[in-house]
Amino acid sequence: MKKGKYIVIEGNDGTGKTTQVELLAEHFRKNGQAVQIVEEPGSDNLTNSTPVANELRKAIKNGSLERSPEINVLLFSAARRELWQKKIAPALNKGKIVLSARNYFSTLAYQGQGEGIDSAEILRLTKLFTHERYMNPDVLIVLVTNHDTRKKRIAKRGALLNPDTFESRNDAFQNTLNNAYAELATKYNLPTIDAGQSIKEIHKQLIDIVKVA
């Protein structure tokens, strides 16, 4: 099933994943390559998602909907299955470059280290709901940052009218996530980029990594 190329940019909220995915897409398209962007667990832009994944995303992001970490894992897994079957796999089969803001590494960080779910169970469910190809991207890059830098970046967005389930968590939880992403990158020997740099510099480093992958 190799055909296309699957590239994932990971990192905590506020590290600039979506911006960098869009810049990479522009870079590849200028070079005549077909690109499919996806956003996990869904997106306001249906070209980057599916209706079912978006409905699951609404439940996931609903901060007033009480649920267990186990339910969060199942909701994310269901959204991934939908994205894999309807967006990612078809695009790869057509030879496209798939650029994703997040994949299951976010669940390893958020639900694994953040909410205490065993990582082996997360991996088992991800494999059950998706595919080996999904679990092994051609390139997976982690944008890392410290707590203070992340807070400053998010503050530039302005006040959130309706913070979601995870945006509303306290500083201790957010710091756990920052550390989780750095630890996962080390564990899986993944390239990292300091998200505290300028957008232009981050993009340049991403291009350099993707070129040699």
List the predicted regions and their residue ranges:
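Conserved lysine of the Walker
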Residues: 17
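Pre-Walker A (Motif I) flank of P-loop NTPase domains
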Residues: 2-6
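ATP-dependent small-molecule kinase phosphotransfer cores
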Residues: 33-131
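NTP-dependent small-molecule kinase module
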Residues: 25, 148-213
